[in-house]
Amino acid sequence: MLKKFRGMFSNDLSIDLGTANTLIYVKGQGIVLNEPSVVAIRQDRAGSPKSVAAVGHDAKQMLGRTPGNIAAIRPMKDGVIADFFVTEKMLQHFIKQVHSNSFMRPSPRVLVCVPVGATQVERRAIRESAQGAGAREVFLIEEPMAAAIGAGLPVSEATGSMVVDIGGGTTEVAVISLNGVVYSSSVRIGGDRFDEAIINYVRRNYGSLIGEATAERIKHEIGSAYPGDEVREIEVRGRNLAEGVPRGFTLNSNEILEALQEPLTGIVSAVMVALEQCPPELASDISERGMVLTGGGALLRNLDRLLMEETGIPVVVAEDPLTCVARGGGKALEMIDMHGGDLFSEE
């Protein structure tokens, strides 16, 4: 009874703690925070205490532009915690930001979405980070399950649903039926690998060095996973490695398609393996109803077309794919209240 009473007054949070972005969904309010998973840490002298200089958008602006005493860090790598201290500081900052007036409210229950490939140690680190950031109770849910719920798939029915969640650090492929994950796999390929591939292509073919932010802009503006009818172009500047000075050059969408071949092949093969290993009845459900793409990577132009051509199965990009996992986590919190926490692990 007391738990229920406290739950009425605290803002329950669903957190999609991503490699690229952190999203927070609050019950009854929707997505209230969508910020880059970046923290700027200041340390004035060796051995002096570290302090947080900026978090989120402000810190992302600093990537590659910081003086010696400030380091802009991305504490999540491949979907899991790479820097425990910085992740906890980032979560504290974000939870404080959305859980205002906490003087009157009890600390929130927090549901965190974790990659299917996360080990027990990595899950415990995520759980302890959330507790250290002020959570009263922590639930963990696997990302593909949250993505499927957020995309509106019938996860509780005796029918196979396939979700491909392409985040910043990982791509999670899962087949879901009767509130359970029947098959899941995680490959460490995502939006970051796309950016890396573009940086490497430019270095190899233009002898120029570009930063992460420029690579991301190229990906968003002219990136494509399948040859299109029109060829788009973009003007960029990078540091010429031979001359050591900035130089401008033009890239087109066909070049970026070529640059992205390796990571795209990895995603396609992960999907093919999932289809091969799926039980026959569920495979027939999927071939009839298709698969759903979620996550920021699903926004890459023509990715649905590529997967459709390679698998021969209908592919749909979820509505607002970037927020699917966080929204699904929010719905899952409501399911906890109705059915108890059997969908989720508290450890």
Curated annotation (Swiss-Prot):
ATP binds at T19, A20, N21, G168, G169, T170, E216, R217, I218, K219, G296, G297, A298, L299. It comes from Escherichia coli (strain K12). Belongs to the FtsA/MreB family. GO terms for biological process: cell morphogenesis; FtsZ-dependent cytokinesis; negative regulation of cell division; peptidoglycan biosynthetic process; regulation of cell shape; regulation of chromosome segregation. Disulfide bonds: none annotated. GO terms for cellular component: cytoplasm; cytoskeleton; plasma membrane; polymeric cytoskeletal fiber. Disruption phenotype: Depletion results in enlarged, spherical cells. Its main location: cytoplasm. CDD domains: ASKHA_NBD_MreB-like. This is Cell shape-determining protein MreB. GO terms for molecular function: ATP binding; identical protein binding.
